[in-house]
């Protein structure tokens, strides 16, 4: 009798990806975030689909349609808050996943890494457009401020902004197209995830030591399916705790006020997961310079493989690099804090120092210390 799992054209793909996949025996909990991101994406697509059934992308009715979802639709409130806070969980997992990649040198799988950067940009774009949809004050002004940044591009900037807006300001046309893009992008992300996994399975997973583990592999199922199931349980517990006890903890109170083009909120700021990039943007007095720094704060990940000067792949046995890595984490937390503060002393100078340190650490300090560690190996 033929084994369907191993011979059926579709089941074979699933089998090689999730069941019989040879996996390093020593991968830690830091390797759980890939599957957790998959879970987040599924949650976002399902909750988003149900929200889209009741949402209207018109400036006159968008805000009331979200209110209607929360008040009148069966379990609409929990679907809405699962979607809003699901985005926060998505970004927590994303940041930890990227951090893991940097710490353990996973970026040396350059194809997988580059698709990952594309995914990061796509998720950020999706989250930004999703934040505009409820059409509250912060939605409107956030959209105005961020899209306006494109006007810093020389020569074509102003035309580009008006083209994206579909007029001379953020209005009905902008909201409709943002809804269309917000709906389609998660499916593009899902397709990119498949490519991400395709490239990953070409090489096999990295492991905490950074040493080739071909001699010591175990099947993905049951070992890592059980481990992932525990991760799913922890993530859903955290998400449900957030949704059921303090759903507005990570949101902005200003977004409960309908959008008003004639009234600017005192502090325009994005969701918490964009604050580090927003702080880098604000720390440069020049508009074009700020926009470039904003893009580079994420795009810099693409040159990570080129900046890897160490003879060892992972930071597991490199204490100096480990110290710098955790300084980088602290720096990003500082930037996140600064991004939420008003533009005044002492926050301006702290933001500028933290932004400088971010690029200085990645571009100069970390590669230099890797070279020093190479020398120390010979002592």
Curated annotation (Swiss-Prot):
<keyword id="KW-0830">Ubiquinone</keyword>
<feature type="transmembrane region" description="Helical">
    <location>
        <begin position="347"/>
        <end position="367"/>
    </location>
</feature>
<comment type="subunit">
    <text>The cytochrome bc1 complex contains 11 subunits: 3 respiratory subunits (MT-CYB, CYC1 and UQCRFS1), 2 core proteins (UQCRC1 and UQCRC2) and 6 low-molecular weight proteins (UQCRH/QCR6, UQCRB/QCR7, UQCRQ/QCR8, UQCR10/QCR9, UQCR11/QCR10 and a cleavage product of UQCRFS1). This cytochrome bc1 complex then forms a dimer.</text>
</comment>
<feature type="binding site" description="axial binding residue">
    <location>
        <position position="97"/>
    </location>
    <ligand>
        <name>heme b b566</name>
    </ligand>
</feature>
<feature type="binding site" description="axial binding residue">
    <location>
        <position position="182"/>
    </location>
    <ligand>
        <name>heme b b562</name>
    </ligand>
</feature>
<feature type="transmembrane region" description="Helical">
    <location>
        <begin position="320"/>
        <end position="340"/>
    </location>
</feature>
<dbReference type="InterPro" id="IPR027387">
    <property type="entry name" value="Cytb/b6-like_sf"/>
</dbReference>
<keyword id="KW-0349">Heme</keyword>
<dbReference type="InterPro" id="IPR005798">
    <property type="entry name" value="Cyt_b/b6_C"/>
</dbReference>
<dbReference type="InterPro" id="IPR005797">
    <property type="entry name" value="Cyt_b/b6_N"/>
</dbReference>
<keyword id="KW-0472">Membrane</keyword>
<keyword id="KW-0999">Mitochondrion inner membrane</keyword>
<feature type="binding site" description="axial binding residue">
    <location>
        <position position="83"/>
    </location>
    <ligand>
        <name>heme b b562</name>
    </ligand>
</feature>
<keyword id="KW-0679">Respiratory chain</keyword>
<keyword id="KW-0408">Iron</keyword>
<dbReference type="GO" id="GO:0008121">
    <property type="term" value="F:ubiquinol-cytochrome-c reductase activity"/>
</dbReference>
<feature type="transmembrane region" description="Helical">
    <location>
        <begin position="226"/>
        <end position="246"/>
    </location>
</feature>
<dbReference type="InterPro" id="IPR016174">
    <property type="entry name" value="Di-haem_cyt_TM"/>
</dbReference>
<dbReference type="InterPro" id="IPR048260">
    <property type="entry name" value="Cytochrome_b_C_euk/bac"/>
</dbReference>
<feature type="transmembrane region" description="Helical">
    <location>
        <begin position="77"/>
        <end position="98"/>
    </location>
</feature>
<dbReference type="InterPro" id="IPR048259">
    <property type="entry name" value="Cytochrome_b_N_euk/bac"/>
</dbReference>
<keyword id="KW-1133">Transmembrane helix</keyword>
<comment type="similarity">
    <text>Belongs to the cytochrome b family.</text>
</comment>
<feature type="transmembrane region" description="Helical">
    <location>
        <begin position="178"/>
        <end position="198"/>
    </location>
</feature>
<keyword id="KW-0496">Mitochondrion</keyword>
<dbReference type="GO" id="GO:0006122">
    <property type="term" value="P:mitochondrial electron transport, ubiquinol to cytochrome c"/>
</dbReference>
<keyword id="KW-0812">Transmembrane</keyword>
<dbReference type="GO" id="GO:0046872">
    <property type="term" value="F:metal ion binding"/>
</dbReference>
<feature type="transmembrane region" description="Helical">
    <location>
        <begin position="113"/>
        <end position="133"/>
    </location>
</feature>
<comment type="function">
    <text>Component of the ubiquinol-cytochrome c reductase complex (complex III or cytochrome b-c1 complex) that is part of the mitochondrial respiratory chain. The b-c1 complex mediates electron transfer from ubiquinol to cytochrome c. Contributes to the generation of a proton gradient across the mitochondrial membrane that is then used for ATP synthesis.</text>
</comment>
<feature type="transmembrane region" description="Helical">
    <location>
        <begin position="288"/>
        <end position="308"/>
    </location>
</feature>
<dbReference type="Pfam" id="PF00032">
    <property type="entry name" value="Cytochrom_B_C"/>
</dbReference>
<feature type="binding site" description="axial binding residue">
    <location>
        <position position="196"/>
    </location>
    <ligand>
        <name>heme b b566</name>
    </ligand>
</feature>
<protein>
    <recommendedName>
        <fullName>Cytochrome b</fullName>
    </recommendedName>
</protein>
<dbReference type="GO" id="GO:0005743">
    <property type="term" value="C:mitochondrial inner membrane"/>
</dbReference>
<feature type="transmembrane region" description="Helical">
    <location>
        <begin position="33"/>
        <end position="53"/>
    </location>
</feature>
<keyword id="KW-0479">Metal-binding</keyword>
<keyword id="KW-0249">Electron transport</keyword>
<dbReference type="InterPro" id="IPR036150">
    <property type="entry name" value="Cyt_b/b6_C_sf"/>
</dbReference>
<dbReference type="Pfam" id="PF00033">
    <property type="entry name" value="Cytochrome_B"/>
</dbReference>
<dbReference type="InterPro" id="IPR030689">
    <property type="entry name" value="Cytochrome_b"/>
</dbReference>
<feature type="binding site">
    <location>
        <position position="201"/>
    </location>
    <ligand>
        <name>a ubiquinone</name>
    </ligand>
</feature>
